[in-house]
Regions:
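Short, conserved charged micro-motifs
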Residues: 71-76, 158-162, 201-204, 248-256, ...
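Acidic, low-complexity central loop/insert segments
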Residues: 109-118, 140-280
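Acidic, proline/glycine-enriched N-terminal capping motif
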Residues: 1-95, 103-105, 113-116, 122, ...
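Short glycine-/aliphatic-rich beta-strand segments at the starts of folded cytosolic domains
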Residues: 57-78, 183-205, 322-332
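Glycine-rich, small/acidic residue-mixed loop/short-helix segments
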Residues: 3, 108, 289, 295-301, ...
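Residue-level signal for inorganic ion chemistry
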Residues: 69, 151, 195-197, 243, ...
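Internal amphipathic helical hairpin motif
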Residues: 71-106, 198-226
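Anionic-ligand-binding alpha/beta catalytic cores of soluble enzymes and soluble regulatory domains
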Residues: 242-331
Length: 410
């Protein structure tokens, strides 16, 4: 795609446009509703950075919405599965959004700023604590927009999810305001990049940016005359950070983090690492027919927060104590199968379906991982399943704990 065409493509992320204009070698790929760099180095180099180093990558496919109005806390709490009112200032929580039948319509992360207290807060929670039992000391200042409540939504579900949420604003003093357009140089527009890997804290210390020792916490700093919002997200195998900033300053921050030792990676490696971590993506591993407990993502559910859309079904499942299938992380022995590949027991009985799969090329040898929806009755009989596609076949085994990836390059 020509540079001029890319610059006017609404799906192109700010980083994609910047790399194109700088003639940095890369390929583009559609990922989560945006055009973003697919590869920026050799696959093994990118995977090693994610697993053992500090990987720098695009998050321009994420979009933000501010929830405004005097009823914002009460209304939002009634629309999502996790706590809103009890969020500690400068923290966030991952949520599912349901319909009245309890089916998942999408997912989002709610972030609360630090400049106001929730008018609905019922059960005070302790301040987040660091790994040593003390309060996490975040350098910088609280982040907050006009309302103090913001949503992060992937581009591929943004329009649908916003339409769903807006349907339920009736007599409420609530407004959902999209905040970013991701166009380079456009006044007020913002974008995001990410840092993932066990050495991310070292990179941040090296360049003088805040390090957070707890997940789902954030702060804001002034850097090069710009406000940069730094959030630590959820990671199973490695810390994951987000940096939100004016898109006009993206090139400088990208280069600055590279001076600290961060290695640029593309979306193909990020996607493979997501699958290895066992973190589901909506529209891929979780779809509209699924119920929350079927996804086994209990970190998205809060059972004492009060009423919300779809709660009756969630509570009914909780009281019954079981669902008939679960999304499970898998390690594969064999070729990487396409999504939709059937999993079977030894006798040929269908046990489930692969929802996503990828190879993780490592210096110590390639590993294959997947996510799959497994029938509960099949899981009760076996933790390993067969699969076949074309002339290829293999075995898929449920991972009870996160995989150990070994050691990286010395």
């Amino acid at each position: 795609m020509a540079e001029s065409d890319l610059a006017t493509n609404p799906q192109a992320t700010a980083l994609a446009i910047i790399l194109e204009s700088s003639h940095t070698p890369h390929t583009l790929s559609a990922y989560r509703g945006a055009l973003t760099p697919q590869e920026l180095d050799a696959p093994e180099v990118e995977t090693e950075a994610l697993a053992f180093g500090a990987a720098l990558h695009d998050l321009g496919w994420m979009r933000r919405v501010e929830v405004r109005g005097s009823d914002r806390f009460r209304w939002l709490s009634g629309m999502v599965t996790n706590t809103v009112n009890d969020l500690f200032p400068n923290t966030g929580a991952w949520n599912l959004v349901l319909d009245a039948q309890g089916h998942i319509q999408g997912d989002l992360t709610v972030w609360r700023g630090g400049e106001e207290q929730s008018p609905q807060r019922r059960s005070p929670v302790s301040p987040p604590r660091d790994d040593n039992g003390g309060q996490d000391k975040l350098r910088g200042t609280p982040f907050a927009g006009e309302s103090g409540l913001q949503l992060e939504i992937a581009s591929d579900q943004f329009d649908k999810l916003l339409a769903h949420l807006n349907k339920f604003i009736v007599m409420d003093d609530v407004e959902l305001v999209p905040l970013d357009t991701d166009q380079v140089g456009e006044t007020g527009s913002e974008t995001a990049i990410g840092l993932t890997g066990p050495l991310v804290p070292e990179v941040l210390e090296r360049v003088g940016l805040p390090v957070m020792t707890i997940p789902m916490a954030g702060t804001s700093v002034e850097w090069n005359g710009m406000d940069v919002r730094i959030l630590r997200g959820y990671g199973v195998l490695a810390p994951q950070y987000e940096f939100w900033l004016p898109s006009a300053g993206l090139s400088k921050l990208w280069s600055f983090l590279r001076t600290g030792g961060a290695v640029p990676v593309g979306c193909a490696a990020v996607e493979a690492f997501r699958i290895a971590e066992g973190i589901p993506a909506y529209g891929i591993d979780m779809v509209e027919r699924d119920l929350p407990q079927e996804t086994a993502q209990m970190r998205a559910l809060h059972f004492s927060k009060g009423c919300y859309l779809g709660q009756e079904i969630v509570e009914r499942i909780r009281a019954r104590g079981a669902v008939h299938r679960h999304l499970r992380p898998l390690e594969l022995a064999g070729a990487v199968p396409p999504a939709g590949t059937e999993l079977t027991l030894d006798d040929g009985t269908v046990a489930g379906t692969i929802t996503s799969a990828a190879e993780l090329p490592l210096r110590s040898g390639a590993r294959q991982f997947a996510l799959g929806m497994i029938r509960a009755d099949a899981e009760a009989k076996s933790q390993s399943f067969r699969y076949k596609f074309g002339a290829a076949e293999g075995m898929a085994s449920i991972l009870e704990t996160p995989p150990r990836l070994g050691k990286g390059r010395a």
